[in-house]
């Protein structure tokens, strides 16, 4: 059943997320992670990881970059790349390498198996 029909009929479960099949999936968590990206070469996408215990590659991670991220780096998204590991992807479009300092990213983790 489409989510719109379920919501319009008032069948929303507080504290849960309605999946594509209409089932309610629980497991929403949020927090911050301080990461220090290694030097990213010119015109290259790099990645940096942090540990998120319990995260699985089938889960959903939403990451928000910090407002003080180096102006020349472009945040390209994030993914649970392995069990307990989140990868944050950054792109350097400039003509020289960028070695940014440690930054604090915020995240929302949706545990699809909880």
Question: Which residue ranges define each predicted feature?
Answer:
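Short, flexible beta-strand-to-coil junctions
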Residues: 65-70, 112-114
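Low-complexity "stalk/linker" and mucin-like segments enriched in Ser/Thr/Pro/Ala/Gly
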Residues: 69-80
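Short, surface-exposed alpha-helix to beta-strand junction/turn motifs within ectodomains of secreted
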Residues: 55-67
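Extracellular receptor-binding modules and their adjoining Ser/Thr/Gly/Asp/Asn-rich linkers
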Residues: 2-55, 83-87, 91-114
